[in-house]
Amino acid sequence: MHSLISSDDVWVLWGFIAVWAAVSIGLEQRFKWASAVSGAIIALAGAMVFTNVGVLPVESPVYDTVWSYVVPLAIPLLLFQINVRQIFKESRRLLFIFLISSVGTVLGSILAFFLLKQHIPYLDKIGGMISASYIGGGVNFAAMAAKFETPGEYVSATVVADNFMMALLFFILISIPALKWFQRHYAMPFEEKVKADGNSGNSAESYWKRKDISLKDIAFNAGAAFALVAVSMKVSGYFKSIFSHPLLTGTLGDQYLVLTSLTVLIIFLFPRFFERLNGSQELGTFLIYLFFVVIGIPADLRLIVTNAPLILLFVFIIAISNLAVSLAAGKLFRVRLEEILLAVNATVGGPTTAAAMAIAKGWRELVAPIMLVGTLGYLIGNYVGTFMGNWFSSFL
């Protein structure tokens, strides 16, 4: 589809992504309304607008570069200041609500399938793909698409609907903590801590106070991040080459799980080195803002209307069912709201987008735990997707 900026205009696209990320951060720290909305939402929503008015292309190698290189570099930078013992404490609670959210995906898939099975071709295959994807992530989506041999045009239409749904759900999840009803009915200790840290004036501006940072800090942050990513990619690639079982390739061969685990191990072994590094949070957060811009770009309403209106309804039912089940169970079992929202994000969008949300909201204690727990979805997603797809096919 034609756009003002072509998909191969690399420098212009990089310029737009970086400038819009900077504008989003600037607005968040300058205006109270923008701080309330959050810079992440401004970055994402602005990118959606620019796509839908025909300025940005829906696809480009530049966006792939952000996913392949920028996001992996951001992850260790954002983990350098964490408390390793706190990670394992938080992970137990997150694991429980993550599994509840996965049940929400399954229930939503069943509901959506029986409502729409007469109206969408190959819905058994699409149902298997989305069931796997909304527990794990894009890796599971691709695996199920290949397994069920879903026709290419329906895979493409589902990807379009899924991209739009993910952007919409991210907007909903990141906005929920600001709503009074949720503040009255759920515990929100992490959100309250962020507000307390920035209790005067603009909370975002107060949270991101100016810090001393030296050339050595920048060099050591960058060097450590690049080294950890490089080693993790090699290790995960090696494990993928020697193991064939999906369970092993899905854990030991997953680059994000290896990267997160290796980073946590190194921080545990050399805590004083990383405690003395300044600027890691700031550098990592800016990289994540580039990611926020990129995930908003594929949400093209024109493609939705043309190719996938009913599939969008299908994925919407599943995502909202996941959210509703998670909120209800979370309330029943007194799970903290931040953990519920991150679990929903991790199931529907994968651990990377969940970690990005935790970063955007300032819930730094939950970044590493949700990355670790979210990768569990990669393991169980394919099993659930296979079962659901085969079961759905018996009704067609």
From Swiss-Prot:
Q: Decide whether keyword Cell inner membrane is in the record.
A: no
Q: Which residues cross the membrane?
A: 7-27, 36-56, 62-82, 94-114, 159-179, 218-238, 250-270, 285-305, 310-330, 340-360, 367-387
The record, for InterPro entries, names:
DUF819
Q: Which UniProt keywords apply?
A: Cell membrane, Membrane, Transmembrane, Transmembrane helix
Q: Name one Pfam family in it.
A: DUF819
Q: Does the keyword Transmembrane helix apply?
A: yes
Q: Where in the cell is it found?
A: Cell membrane
- Give membrane topology per the record: Multi-pass membrane protein
Q: What is the protein name given in its UniProt record?
A: Uncharacterized membrane protein YjcL
Instruction: Cite a GO CC annotation.
Output: plasma membrane
